[in-house]
């Protein structure tokens, strides 16, 4: 019998005292998609207080295929709040209601693949004003938390090989407004949010596939395949049905890629204790992102993350969400299947 359990308390919605690890990260992420307008976006703040900065990302998928994108590493002096670079997250009621706001510049990309060369993309595409204000409401239970020993002691982790020590997710609804360069949209959609904390290097995982899916208010999915090494791969996720979660015990994803090795279409299968599921995905709009780090011995590491607004079909019903594919890049090529 395992002496490890998953714990999640309302106070975990607020920020924690950082570990001593230099790469301590505490992050929140939200996505929301308006099914009728076929638009939406995602917002992320990752505090790295021991390094003195936050990672701020705003990504908006517009109905005409353009993408508004901004990334920054604003300085921070505390981990007590998520408020950096024009982005702010507030917990109004733990597990139930949160608020997402962004006010600042955004890069307006006619061709999102320009981000294959970020330096060139930021020089050649216009920066315009963006304001977003969205209230997020949970429509599901919480999933996840922190793995601890039953006596309350945390598990020992090597910070150099860590992606997080705690993680949870929740399917959500989102209502609010997005204003870009004077064009305003009222958003009434569905999505998913997550939170993680603990030491993180983006290079700690060889590759992963993460699908967030909202078919409607009653049906949703999250598929996760995390390949940490040849001998370590985790496949799982959740099915939202009738207001409760079923845990995915196993899953697989078969992907068709385009000429740039970006996900184009795919089929995902999942097994729970009670049922089996098949969901098809077609990417509508995608932006390629990357993270680079130089190790202490001078090795240059490159991680590619492709973020696709995706149309999903389950039993003939159409929904929307994200497909996020992370790969380490070796000899110029992503290493995942």
Residue map of PLM features:
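Structured soluble/peripheral alpha/beta segments that form catalytic or ligand/cofactor-binding pockets
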Residues: 1-337
């Amino acid at each position: 019998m395992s002496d490890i359990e998953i714990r999640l308390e309302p106070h975990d919605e607020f920020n924690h005292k950082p570990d001593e690890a230099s790469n301590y990260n505490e992050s929140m992420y939200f996505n929301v998609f308006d099914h009728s307008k076929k638009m939406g976006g995602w917002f992320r703040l990752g505090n790295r207080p021991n390094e003195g900065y936050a990672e701020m990302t705003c990504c908006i998928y517009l109905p005409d295929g353009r993408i508004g994108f901004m990334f920054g590493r604003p300085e921070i002096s505390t981990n007590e709040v998520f408020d950096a670079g024009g982005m702010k997250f507030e917990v109004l009621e733990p597990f139930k209601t949160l608020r997402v706001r962004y006010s600042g510049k955004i890069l307006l990309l006619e061709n999102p693949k320009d981000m294959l060369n970020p330096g060139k993309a930021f020089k050649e595409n216009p920066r315009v004003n963006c304001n977003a204000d969205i209230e997020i409401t949970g429509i599901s239970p919480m999933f996840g938390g922190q793995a601890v020993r039953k006596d309350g002691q945390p598990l020992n982790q090597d910070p150099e090989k860590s992606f997080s020590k705690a993680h949870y997710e929740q399917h959500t609804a989102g209502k609010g407004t997005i204003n870009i360069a004077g064009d305003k949209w009222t958003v009434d959609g569905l999505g998913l949010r997550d939170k993680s904390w603990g030491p993180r290097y983006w290079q700690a995982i060889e590759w992963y596939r993460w699908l967030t899916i909202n078919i409607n208010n009653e049906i949703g999915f999250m598929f996760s395949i995390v390949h940490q090494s040849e001998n370590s791969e985790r496949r799982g996720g959740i099915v939202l049905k009738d207001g409760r979660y079923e845990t995915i015990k196993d899953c697989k994803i078969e992907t068709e890629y385009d000429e740039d090795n970006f996900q184009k279409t795919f089929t995902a299968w999942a097994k729970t204790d009670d049922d089996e599921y098949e969901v098809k995905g077609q990417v509508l709009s995608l932006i390629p992102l990357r993270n680079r780090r130089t190790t202490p011995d001078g090795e240059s590491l490159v991680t590619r993350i492709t973020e696709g607004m995706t149309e999903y079909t389950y039993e003939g019903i159409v929904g929307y969400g994200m497909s996020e594919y992370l790969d380490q890049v070796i000899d110029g090529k992503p290493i995942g299947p």
